[in-house]
């Protein structure tokens, strides 16, 4: 075949795609090349033909059946170097085919050598009988059994090899199919023609697995029965034990471990090879497969078990795949976090993302629009809750954009109240509502702000569309946000020294647990560090107050195999971490900042009088101000007794 190269330059690409060749034009230069050799493991080499400078001539016998690219590397002198690029999947399929071919050849060679050797040994029986002397009488007595074993191997060895080979084939097929994710099979099937192997697999996976299991069972039983029959004929009852041991080792090594290891590491390529033969076999075994399927379904019904349709990929599997994609570099860590946030948004409640009422900036509805303008200049909020009489009595939402309608009407700015301009009524949502449903309501109602109510109908905060979006993409700031507002919104954890952290009270408890590598008690009712600190103290602490708490380490795993009596104290020491909490800032209503200082000296802990074990029990030292019933001494005695027991057990090894 010949190609006109009058439009090609000295650097060009010839691409093989579905029996057609494309030639991108680069520059005008006339020359021709002729195929000298073709080897898929080496670059193709072409040479110019001075007699005809406008054609490439390919020799007969050149195989272009593979999907590949030929790229001109150089065109100097009389030779042009061409490199061939195979896709990764094609190379893997070829490697699997080569592996299978080598396995078949190796098995054939072993069988041939075995049969040839058995024939030679059996032919030399008479010579052996003459050559044996009395000194090796024991070996001569064992020779008849050995001769019988060799004879059986010669007669039935080929059948046994075929059965073991089929068993290995079925094991590879089963592992390759079950290893592929359902979504991966679907993806591969969509890229194939109608008669593609993965389309066949996707159409009825159960039929393939049933066929494989039937085939595996039949060939393994047949191989075991064949060996057992021969061993029993030679060794009698002892042959059963010998056959069991030999077949156990043979099946494990030759038909289970080795084939399945190959299939696990090359699931896609192995499946591409084995699916079609299994499909043909399933047509033959279809009646048997249907009977087995009906029987298994009947047994499940008798046991009270019902099959249920599962999604292609569960949420946990999807998160696992996202983690693998992030580790492999396919996606960024931020992309992984965003996708996981979308998956978790249905389980997130409004109370977890809302702005609490104590932090809400609202305006009195009785004020004029001039007051609202001054309010907007100060806070720069585009939407402001409007209340009447009390901050928790929110009646509507005022839009700063609506002020533009009153600018031409100067007198109305003073005579019109904010409540008259506000959009009423406000959109109210329960605090238990999921963020996913809230987002849907925002889209339906075309609003960006809602008032959050508790179960008693009291206002506890507001939530905006920005709060919902931030649950997915992370915190969003604009040019008007000050440093204080950003810290108030996100919280912060600053490491002052080794084991010393300054933490903003608005920091989420999950962020604190991750940073300090600690685990909070299950079922806790707080969302921020402020709630944790208040629970640790038992009241709202003042600036300068401190308390020592015992927390559980996040990465600690209990070793059940250890002797409980001998290692209990050592386990407690490794399991828990002690922190001293000092209030850095706060007021009568809330805590603003707190310092976490890790305590490693157990003697210092023993001298402390205010240790509180946050996991799993909660104990505290009572102060004189809280002694309402006059039992201060009795209360502290109970505390001291518990404190001594806890600290001594953690101090001793």
Swiss-Prot record:
Gene source species: Arabidopsis thaliana
InterPro entries: CBS_dom, CBS_dom_sf, CNNM, FAD-bd_PCMH-like_sf, FAD-bd_PCMH_sub2, Ion_transp-like_CBS, Transptr-assoc_dom
A Pfam family assignment: CNNM
Cellular component GO terms held in the UniProt record: chloroplast envelope; chloroplast membrane; nucleus; plastid
Principal cellular location given in the protein's record: plastid
Residue span(s) of domain CNNM transmembrane: 149-335
Keyword annotations of the record: CBS domain, Chloroplast, Membrane, Plastid, Repeat, Transit peptide, Transmembrane, Transmembrane helix, Transport
Record-given protein name: DUF21 domain-containing protein At1g55930, chloroplastic
């Amino acid at each position: 075949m010949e190609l006109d190269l009058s439009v090609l330059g000295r650097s060009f690409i010839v691409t093989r795609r579905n029996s057609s060749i494309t030639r991108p034009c680069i520059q005008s230069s006339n020359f021709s090349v002729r195929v000298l050799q073709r080897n898929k493991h080496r670059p193709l080499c072409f040479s110019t033909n001075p007699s005809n400078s406008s054609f490439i001539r390919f020799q007969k016998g050149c195989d272009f059946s593979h999907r590949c690219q030929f790229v001109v590397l150089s065109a100097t002198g009389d030779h042009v170097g061409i490199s061939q690029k195979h896709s990764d999947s094609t190379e893997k399929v070829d490697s699997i085919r080569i592996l299978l071919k080598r396995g078949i050849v190796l098995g054939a060679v072993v069988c041939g050598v075995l049969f040839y050797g058995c024939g030679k040994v059996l032919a030399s029986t008479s010579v052996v009988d003459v050559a044996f002397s009395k000194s090796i009488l024991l070996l001569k007595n064992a020779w008849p059994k050995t001769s019988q074993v060799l004879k059986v191997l010669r007669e039935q060895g080929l059948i046994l090899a075929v059965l073991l080979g089929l068993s290995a084939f079925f094991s590879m097929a089963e592992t390759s199919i079950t290893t592929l994710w359902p979504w991966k099979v679907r993806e591969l099937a969509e890229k194939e023609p109608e008669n593609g192997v993965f389309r066949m697999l996707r159409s009825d996976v159960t039929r393939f697995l049933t066929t494989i299991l039937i085939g595996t069972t039949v060939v393994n039983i047949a191989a075991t029965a064949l060996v057992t029959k021969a061993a029993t004929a030679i060794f009698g009852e002892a042959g059963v034990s010998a056959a069991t041991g030999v077949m156990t080792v043979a099946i494990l090594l030759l038909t289970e471990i080795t084939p399945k290891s190959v299939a696990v590491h090359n699931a896609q390529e192995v499946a591409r090879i084995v699916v079609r033969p299994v499909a043909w076999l399933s047509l033959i075994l279809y009646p048997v497969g249907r009977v087995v399927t009906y029987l298994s379904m009947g047994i499940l019904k008798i046991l009270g078990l019902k099959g249920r349709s599962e999604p292609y990929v569960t949420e946990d599997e999807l998160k696992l795949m996202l983690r693998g994609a992030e580790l492999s570099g396919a996606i960024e860590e931020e992309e992984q976090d965003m996708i996981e946030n979308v998956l978790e948004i249905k389980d997130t409640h409004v109370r977890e993302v809302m702005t609490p009422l104590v932090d809400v900036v609202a305006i009195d509805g009785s004020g004029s629009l001039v007051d609202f303008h001054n309010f907007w200049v100060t806070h720069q909020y585009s939407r402001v809750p409007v209340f009447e009489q009390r901050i928790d009595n929110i009646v509507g939402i005022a839009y700063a954009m609506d002020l533009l309608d009153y600018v031409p009407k100067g007198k109305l700015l003073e005579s019109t109240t904010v409540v008259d301009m506000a959009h009423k009524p406000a959109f109210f949502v329960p605090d238990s509502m999921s963020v996913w449903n809230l987002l849907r309501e925002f889209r339906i109602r075309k609003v960006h702000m809602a008032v959050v109510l508790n179960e008693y109908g009291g206002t506890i905060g507001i939530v905006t569309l920005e709060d919902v979006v931030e649950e997915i993409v992370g915190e969003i700031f604009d040019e008007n946000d000050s440093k204080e507002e950003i810290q108030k919104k996100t919280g912060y954890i600053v490491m002052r020294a080794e084991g010393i952290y300054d933490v903003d009270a608005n920091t989420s408890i999950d962020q604190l647990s991750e940073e300090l590598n600690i685990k909070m008690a299950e079922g806790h009712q707080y969302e921020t560090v402020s709630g944790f600190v208040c629970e640790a103290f038992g009241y709202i602490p003042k600036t300068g107050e401190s308390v020592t708490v015992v927390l559980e380490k996040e990465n600690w795993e209990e070793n059940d195999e250890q002797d409980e009596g001998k290692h209990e104290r050592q386990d407690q020491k490794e399991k828990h971490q002690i922190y001293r909490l000092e209030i850095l800032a706060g007021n009568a209503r809330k805590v603003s900042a707190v310092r976490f200082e890790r305590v490693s000296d157990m003697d210092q802990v023993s001298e402390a009088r205010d240790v509180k074990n946050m996991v799993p029990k909660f104990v505290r030292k009572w102060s004189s101000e809280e002694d309402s019933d006059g039992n201060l001494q009795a209360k502290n005695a109970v505390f001291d007794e518990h404190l001594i027991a806890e600290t001594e057990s953690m101090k001793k090894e």
